[in-house]
Design a protein with these regions (language model features):
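Alpha-helical scaffold domains
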Residues: 1-234
Length: 234
């Protein structure tokens, strides 16, 4: 299974895309990038998941860390397809510590999470998010913030979720960038609840300013609000 997937990935290789995409991935060894576009990877992962059983896929899923960046992305997209929550969580927990870049971290969300989110996400997803956010692994923390942002800033919102992310104390760029993304998104969806975080300087300086920058870039925020946010930059 491992050799089969690697062989197919090289068949999909796009050298111009490899050159472009490599520049966006400073945290990983450039030699590990084959150069396969995400839509191609996602389509291939769906085909593999449909054709093979989880048992068939286990040699690949257990082969961590993977040799190639695109193998990580295939792994993520395979996890995304698993419909059984417990099995999905098991495979996700095994995989998260091996994520070594922002792109793999951000490009997938298990479909079963979406089903859970429609029922009782506070009972099932929220404890997992809190666990991930307290991790020592950069991209596990980032993943947790991303899932919180995806499922808990709309009708399931509670102001305590803002405190959960604001209380993260990290010097890691890829964690703080996700924190800024979270708060910028929160400003577009829960403005009244989120604004005091900015007005009262709750965040560290870098995340504070990056949040404002990203919010100002959003088309979902009015011109008047953007002008006010500009005045809050430090």
């Amino acid at each position: 299974m491992i050799e089969f997937i690697q062989k197919k990935l090289f068949e999909f290789q796009d050298l111009k895309y490899k050159e472009f995409h490599s520049k966006l991935m400073p945290t990983i060894n450039q030699k590990s990038i084959i150069g396969v576009r995400v839509p191609v990877l996602r389509k291939f992962a769906k085909e593999v998941f449909k054709e093979y059983s989880i048992e068939d896929l286990k040699p690949f899923l257990k082969n961590l860390p993977h040799k190639y960046y695109e193998e990580n992305n295939i792994h993520a997209f395979l996890i995304e397809q698993i419909n059984d929550f417990e099995l999905c969580f098991f495979e996700l927990e095994n995989f998260l510590p091996f994520i070594d870049n922002w792109a793999t971290c951000d490009m997938f969300c298990p479909k079963v999470f979406k089903k859970v989110a429609k029922k009782k996400p506070e009972e099932i997803l929220l404890p997992l998010i809190k666990k991930w956010i307290s991790s020592n692994e950069i991209y596990t923390v980032r993943f947790g913030i991303g899932i919180l942002m995806r499922f808990f800033l709309d009708e399931k919102f509670d102001s305590s979720y803002l405190d959960l992310v604001s209380s993260i104390n990290s010097n890691e760029y890829y964690i703080n960038m996700m924190r800024a993304w979270f708060f910028a998104t929160a400003l577009t969806k829960q403005y009244e609840a989120t604004l005091p975080i900015i007005e009262n300087n709750i965040l560290d300086l870098w995340t504070h300013n990056k949040t404002i920058q990203k919010a100002i870039e959003s088309y979902r925020i009015s011109a008047d609000t953007k002008n006010y946010l500009r005045k809050l930059k430090k």
